[in-house]
């Protein structure tokens, strides 16, 4: 597994779906070029949390995580997980999974407790559903695996379309 070194700054007026797709695509292409893996299939992805038309950041500090959680408290938001598969012949296939998540109203103590656990670090929207944040979620509509970061249904379909022997 490799990390792509790309600029992940959203472009001016770029909508969340377009941003997620662009990130997955650019990561796949960057990994192919940087690591000279043209002869291999490259699967890349990105998970984006959006509130309205706003793309929330990946929380790199407590203040950002706290801001994201306060914004999401008691609200619905979308988690967009885009994947891109680049084949050795240069074909690029893409899929996007969209999941709606609603947090329960969060108290300051709940936010503080979640922040103290550190699961938020590097996570889109400042939370990781596969950890204790699951207890903060009132409901989810869509793909749980997409919120974790790899939409399994879409990944399977993408690999099958590329000719992988999947039954």
Where are these regions (language model features)?
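A short beta-strand-loop structural module common to alpha/beta enzyme folds
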Residues: 1-9
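Anionic-ligand binding patches
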Residues: 12-167
